[in-house]
Regions:
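Structured loops at beta-to-helix junctions and adjacent beta-edge loops in soluble globular domains
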Residues: 11, 51-53, 83
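A glycine-rich, hydrophobic loop/mini-helix early in the fold
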Residues: 40-76
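Acidic-enriched, low-complexity/disordered segments with a strong bias for Aspartate over Glutamate
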Residues: 4, 15, 40, 56, ...
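N-terminal domain-onset segments
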Residues: 1-45, 164, 174, 181, ...
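Interaction-surface and assembly-scaffold signal
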Residues: 71-190
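Short, low-complexity, polar/charged sequence segments that are solvent-exposed and flexible
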Residues: 26-29, 50-51, 69, 99
Length: 190
């Protein structure tokens, strides 16, 4: 299958992320990530996750996952639309990489009440940086536009203790976007 993968990360208050994480997970960085895919030019898919560590495994924990996501293409722009979210990626013709790749053993997914680690996919194809804009459609949902550069997500010490909150898409999506940190697209065979 040919996969066009689009990835965007945005900064979010790390203390709020800590309050959401399930038992046994620790927040690595103040970041939320949206991964979107077009599979064989026909089917869209989307995931929402945050950087986390569990049992010495550093990577991501999945907050939400959608299949059969509607998408449109126009020129270099690809837009994914859900009732909860709209996100667009526009290739800018500059190749680069992702700083989080070096610190990623995989992603934890919740199934039947248990989190399972799925190893990171090895992708050797070149990545193209993208401009990106997104908006969660929940009341008070995060939204943002990229600045045309990649910014680091630097871990923050705890400064505010929030009450534990349910690990849900809506609770994560209403944490304000401090800044879109970067976005890229890559095409590969899976």
């Amino acid at each position: 299958m040919i996969v066009e993968q689009f990835v965007m990360a945005y900064g979010a208050e790390q203390d709020r992320l800590r309050a959401l994480l399930p038992e046994g997970f620790a927040s690595l960085r103040p970041v939320l990530r949206i991964n979107a895919e077009v599979r064989d030019g026909k089917t869209g898919a989307l995931e929402f996750n945050t950087a986390a560590e569990k049992a010495d495994n550093r990577g991501w924990v999945n907050i939400g996952r959608w299949d059969d996501v509607p998408f449109t293409k126009g020129g270099k722009k690809t837009t994914f639309t859900l009732p909860e979210l709209t996100i667009s990626f526009t290739g800018v013709g500059i190749e680069g990489g992702c700083p989080a790749e070096k610190d990623n053993v995989g992603c934890y997914y919740l199934k039947d009440g248990t989190f399972t680690l799925v190893p990171a996919e090895k992708i050797t194809a070149n990545k193209e940086f993208c401009d990106c804009e997104f908006a969660w459609r929940f009341a008070g949902g995060a939204h943002g536009v990229s600045l045309g550069k990649t910014l680091p997500a630097i871990p923050e010490e705890e400064t505010t203790h929030y009450e534990k909150a349910a690990f849900t898409v809506e609770n994560a999506a209403v944490i304000p976007c401090m800044q879109v940190l970067g976005a890229y697209q890559v095409t590969f065979e899976r």
